[in-house]
Amino acid sequence: FDHIFAEHQNTRLIIATFASNVDRVQQIINSAYKYGRKVVVEGRSMVNIISTASALGYLNVPENTLIEIDQMKNYPPEKMVLITTGSQGESMAALSRMAADVHRKVTIQPNDTIIFSSNPIPGNEKAVSKVINELSMKGAKVIFQDVHVSGHACLEEVKLIYGVVRPKYAIPVHGEYRHLTAQKHVVEDLGIPKENIFILASGNVL
């Protein structure tokens, strides 16, 4: 996790993982402490397991690192990391409620970075994709480990095509919203002005 924290020091981090993966939670807490971030734990199972693991000595939380969710407003977003349930797209999990704008305490912001720190269990792919797309539509950056899609152009091939064609305008097509957003970021990095890149829904007229 260290490289993710190092590369995203100006955004709020929201990390979804299995509550039972105490070792992963420890890694997140260690990185948060290293980079001077406060940690909020959200999701009932996550809160319960972290509390139990800490009490039994399986989890080491540095003093003054863990705060309550109501205290988030006292800190700038870039000094916060939320560890949350919902990595499998469960409809009532904390991250799913954030994505659907029905979470009472957390509102997704365009500058947020959300990390899915687990691959979807077979059968959950559709639910996970739905949450990722909802988060992307809110302008948040989503980091998802399972990025391989067989038969599609890889990142360097996409860069090559844009480098050869050098278009004035770009309209990413063919993919879910998160794929279009990812291509948009690539195009921006290649020097095409943000105002010349359009993500359109079916039926939109440009």
Model-derived features: where do they sit?
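Acidic/His-rich, metal-assisted hydrolase cores and their charged scaffolds
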Residues: 1-206
